[in-house]
């Protein structure tokens, strides 16, 4: 069982570290002819409050199908109660590797092969990363 630290700062760093460590795993891989290489560079990880007014603004701008943190929490955990200010949203960005950016910058009509691979295999990794974050938070 993974022990989540009590202090907010420690918990933030613990979650960031869990995400970062997973990106160092073999799951973060592009199967290229030249061999496997990481699909993504080190992730950028951020947090926001569940009651951030931007979520309501997104809903107004995007449409009623956009779920606020409170709405998705209630749909996912119908028996649990949590106020919006008790929720934290975890977000991450998986930056393209320098080599992918370089290869793609040389292309004029179609994406570079490495970029196309990162689109497919990188998104597969992103799904696994989401599952991993859920797993460690539930432990």
Annotate each PLM feature.
Residues 2-122:
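Non-catalytic, usually N-terminal nucleic-acid engagement modules in DNA/RNA processing proteins
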Residues 119-139:
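Signature of the catalytic double-stranded beta-helix
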């Amino acid at each position: 069982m993974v022990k989540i630290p009590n202090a907010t700062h420690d918990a933030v760093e613990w979650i960031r570290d869990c995400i970062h460590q997973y990106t160092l795993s073999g799951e973060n891989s592009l199967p290229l002819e030249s061999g496997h290489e990481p699909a993504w560079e080190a992730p950028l990880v951020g947090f926001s409050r569940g009651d951030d007014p931007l979520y309501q603004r997104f809903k107004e701008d995007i449409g009623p199908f956009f779920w606020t943190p409170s709405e998705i929490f209630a749909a996912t955990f119908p028996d649990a109660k949590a106020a919006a200010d008790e929720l934290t949203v975890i977000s991450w960005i998986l930056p393209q590797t320098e080599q992918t950016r370089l290869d793609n910058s040389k292309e004029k009509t179609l994406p570079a092969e490495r970029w196309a691979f990162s689109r497919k295999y990188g998104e597969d990794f992103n799904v696994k990363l989401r599952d991993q974050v859920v797993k460690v938070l539930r432990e």
